[in-house]
Amino acid sequence: MDYLDLGPYSSASGTVRLPGSKSISNRVLLLAALAEGETTITNLLDSDDTRVMLDALGKLGVKLARDGDTCVVTGTRGAFTAKTADLFLGNAGTAVRPLTAALAVNGGDYRVHGVPRMHERPIGDLVDGLRQIGAQIDYELNEGYPPLRIKPATISVDAPIRVRGDVSSQFLTALLMTLPLVKAKDGRTVVEVDGELISKPYIDITIRLMARFGVTVERDGWQRFVVPAGVRYRSPGRIMVEGDASSASYFLAAGALGGGPLRVEGVGRASIQGDVGFANALMQMGANVTMGDDWIDVRGIGHDHGKLEPIDMDFNLIPDAAMTIAVAALFANGTSTLRNIASWRVKETDRIAAMATELRKVGAIVEEGPDYLVVTPPAKLTPNAAIDTYDDHRMAMCFSLVSLGGVPVRINDPKCVGKTFPDYFDRFAALAKA
């Protein structure tokens, strides 16, 4: 097995420029592909998840010209030209969910599949929503999960569409992005959400990006959304992808744990991503955080000089960045509780189980619940722990922070960070100091 040994490190400081946001990159690629006109996307993330989206769009007949982190997309005016395609989408939820919806109304015959873990990640709530407007979608193996066969269908909207919001916000995102392509009798489509909508900031990203492409979604709280029907996305001409706020969390935590000062560039006050809220969680734990429009500075205590404060917080709004808090809790002076994180169970791996298992390897006492995690740090971290990463990029990046506790740590299968941040460990090593 491939592995990477890190540390021991005693401090972390410097400046890091973030790669483009995965969530924004894949949304913008699909919107640009469906739009009228040519869109130049800058600071586009280059990672496994964006590559599978680009590959799929190419197979669907979208004209793409890539040069470094810039991509010029020639829009299809709402309909992909390829009416048959076999699309492999890896483990990219940000690709498989929105593309499934767009393909369901495109009038073609498509197969959508991915890696084995993708075939364990639920998609049934989205399929149920699409079937309400006439979509013809079959499950190849297990009911409610990919692989999917999508067939030509007569699509019509004559009643509000209902979709569950308590498993993944990507189901609602997929519907919102696709419904402008579908005609409705009164020129609009209503989507009603069943249950508590999780990850609300990601829906906000979707709505803001749709507006950049000329389509305005109205919402009544987080339970009812009104989408213009039978309209066309229009290219904004040029759009820049802001830095990835989830990826920022590892460096911000490094600054807090390793003393700093550490500056992250590419996200800040002006960010449309909810995960910038991670900075507030760090502040609650005692880190010193300042923020500009597109940068965040953090100074911490350094493990030799003190401890972070424990935290007890609802992380429903920022579940991805919350993983970083679970590891930062190793450096607190008491027990921390992460609440309302049930969505971790259906991510790249069962992140609650995985996080509990790996935190115990470095000496923590962990209580694992259906939607919560309680972490009591050890008096001293266990050196040379071999951390399994479960083909989950965030597990690998989170546990790099253990090395700032003055102990070496081994990260198994470090290449899994390629999903969102291929050169993460090089960037981390440039900031961490022995």
UniProtKB/Swiss-Prot annotation:
It catalyses: 3-phosphoshikimate + phosphoenolpyruvate = 5-O-(1-carboxyvinyl)-3-phosphoshikimate + phosphate. Transmembrane segments: none annotated. Signal peptide: none annotated. Pathway: Metabolic intermediate biosynthesis; chorismate biosynthesis; chorismate from D-erythrose 4-phosphate and phosphoenolpyruvate: step 6/7. CDD domains: EPSP_synthase (cd01556). It is found in: Cytoplasm. Keywords: Amino-acid biosynthesis, Aromatic amino acid biosynthesis, Cytoplasm, Transferase. Its EC number is 2.5.1.19. 3-phosphoshikimate binds at residues 22-23, 27, 168-170, 199, 320, 347. GO terms for biological process: amino acid biosynthetic process; aromatic amino acid family biosynthetic process; chorismate biosynthetic process. GO terms for molecular function: 3-phosphoshikimate 1-carboxyvinyltransferase activity. Gene3D superfamilies: Enolpyruvate transferase domain (3.65.10.10). NCBIfam families: aroA. Belongs to the EPSP synthase family. Catalyzes the transfer of the enolpyruvyl moiety of phosphoenolpyruvate (PEP) to the 5-hydroxyl of shikimate-3-phosphate (S3P) to produce enolpyruvyl shikimate-3-phosphate and inorganic phosphate. Monomer. This is 3-phosphoshikimate 1-carboxyvinyltransferase. It comes from Burkholderia cenocepacia (strain ATCC BAA-245 / DSM 16553 / LMG 16656 / NCTC 13227 / J2315 / CF5610) (Burkholderia cepacia (strain J2315)). The gene is aroA.
